[in-house]
């Protein structure tokens, strides 16, 4: 069965795009005149004996056929890997019989082969499985055989190059007279040994670049980071640009999506770096504003004001002693009327007082010359010793003045007969 779909079943394979036009799907791309003539010429050729196989059918009859992988390779060469497609429109299980523990299954399948311009051919295939003990394996074998048979029958409708020449009996008889060529040796150096194909990827990417430069498949990305980026392809009026493969568009969309993800990651890193700089700036200002603490060493004195306090204390004690001595001298000073033999304390100093004062001054000088380390080690004990020394000096001075007063009283009694 053959035919050409009108509007591809009412336009079911087309859908409106965001730009207001329609995006061409498979089955709507037209062949150019040059491409049409080249395909038509190739389909008229008949297959050689290298493509045709034979087997014995029921009743001892010899049957010629084309293997499934060969017919698929021929279709790819004629139409291109993305220029044709096949689909199973219907599949029926005719019977499933169990006989002596073995299954017998028959399945029929309707297969349609469609080209990129919308033309298609459809045919029926049949598959049989006999004598298997597993029901599942029997159904699998019958279904696959039915689909393969229907595919070969549908492709055969396109021309001699896809198997239609096998039905010509005269051609097969003449074909048997031709000497069969020896099979070519397999060249393992050209075998595929790795998954990556750099030449194919580079060619696919380069084919997309001119179209993007001309503005035909402009990809519009969504700028919102919360939604995944997607590409919108506007409609194109040029028919030649409509033949761009869907795989190339998908690869370009994937490339743009990866670029967008990299941009979002870079923006996130920049924001995080700015936040870290903002957090580190106040801490740095606080550290600069705070005065640096002096380094603590073992030679640094514990209290710096102790020597100054000690000097002030010594100066105050000295002034108090001098003032006390002056008050005592004024108190016990004798007027000139008392007689010539009276000794005036204010006129000359007492030997005991002079010696005590000199001893106190020497002790103060010695204390001032004492190293600071000793003062820092025992400040409390030193202040206590100075208080004791001052108290003893006052006691000696007071005792000397009392003895001097007694001697003056004795002299007064001698000079005064009454």
From Swiss-Prot:
Phosphothreonine modified-residue sites: 318, 335
GO cellular component entries: nucleoplasm; nucleus; protein-containing complex; protein-DNA complex
Annotated region described as Mediates interaction with RPA2, given as residue ranges: 221-280
InterPro entries registered for this protein in UniProt: DNA_recomb/repair_Rad52, Rad52_fam, Rad52_Rad59_Rad22, Rad52_Rad59_Rad22_sf
Region span, Disordered: 219-302, 368-418
Assigned keywords, A-Z: DNA damage, DNA recombination, DNA repair, DNA-binding, Nucleus, Phosphoprotein
Major site of localization recorded for this protein: nucleus
Impact noted for substituting residue 152 to A: Abolishes ssDNA-binding
Keyword check for Phosphoprotein: yes
Biased composition (Polar residues): 380-401
Listed Low complexity bias regions: 240-251
Post-translational modifications reported in the UniProt record: Phosphorylated upon DNA damage by ABL1, and probably by ATM or ATR.
Residue(s) carrying Phosphotyrosine: 104
Record family assignment: Belongs to the RAD52 family.
Function recorded in the entry: Involved in double-stranded break repair. Plays a central role in genetic recombination and DNA repair by promoting the annealing of complementary single-stranded DNA and by stimulation of the RAD51 recombinase.
NCBIfam families given in the database record: rad52
Listed name of the protein: DNA repair protein RAD52 homolog
Species assigned in the record: Homo sapiens
Name of the encoding gene: RAD52
């Amino acid at each position: 069965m053959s035919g050409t779909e009108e509007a591809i079943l009412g336009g079911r394979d087309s859908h409106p795009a965001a730009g207001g036009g329609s995006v061409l799907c498979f089955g709507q791309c037209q062949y150019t005149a040059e491409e049409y003539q080249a395909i038509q010429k190739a389909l008229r050729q008949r297959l050689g004996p290298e493509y045709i196989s034979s087997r014995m059918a029921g009743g001892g009859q010899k049957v010629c056929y084309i293997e499934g992988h060969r017919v698929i390779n021929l279709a790819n060469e004629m139409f291109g890997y993305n220029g044709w497609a096949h689909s199973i429109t219907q599949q029926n299980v005719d019977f499933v019989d169990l006989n002596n523990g073995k299954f017998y299954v028959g399945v029929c399948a309707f297969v349609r082969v469609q080209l990129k311009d919308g033309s298609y051919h459809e045919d029926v295939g049949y598959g049989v499985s006999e004598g298997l003990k597993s029901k599942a394996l029997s159904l699998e074998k019958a279904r696959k055989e039915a689909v393969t048979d229907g595919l070969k029958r549908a492709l055969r409708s396109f021309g001699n190059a896809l198997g239609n020449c096998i039905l010509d009996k005269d051609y097969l008889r003449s074909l048997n007279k031709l000497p069969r060529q020896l099979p070519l040796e397999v060249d393992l150096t050209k075998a595929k040994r790795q998954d990556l194909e750099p030449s194919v990827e580079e060619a696919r990417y380069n084919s997309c670049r001119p179209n993007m430069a001309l503005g035909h498949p402009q990809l519009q990305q969504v700028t919102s980071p919360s939604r995944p980026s997607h590409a919108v392809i506007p409609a194109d009026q040029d028919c030649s640009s409509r033949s761009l493969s869907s795989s190339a568009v998908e690869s370009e969309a994937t490339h743009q999506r990866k670029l967008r993800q990299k941009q979002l990651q870079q923006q996130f890193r920049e924001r995080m770096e700015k936040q870290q700089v903002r957090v580190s700036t106040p801490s740095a200002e606080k550290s600069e504003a705070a005065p640096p603490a002096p380094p603590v060493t073992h030679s640094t004195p514990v209290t710096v004001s102790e020597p100054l306090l000690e000097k002030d204390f010594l100066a105050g004690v000295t002034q108090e002693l001098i003032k006390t001595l002056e008050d005592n001298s004024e108190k016990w000073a004798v007027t000139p009327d008392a007689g010539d033999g009276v000794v005036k304390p204010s006129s000359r100093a007492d030997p005991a007082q002079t010696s005590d004062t000199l001893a106190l001054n020497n002790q103060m000088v010695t204390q001032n010359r004492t190293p600071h380390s000793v003062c820092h080690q025992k400040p409390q004990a030193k202040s206590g010793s100075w208080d004791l020394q001052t108290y003893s000096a006052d006691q000696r001075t007071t005792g000397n003045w009392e003895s001097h007063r007694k001697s003056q009283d004795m002299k007064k009694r001698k000079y005064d007969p009454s």
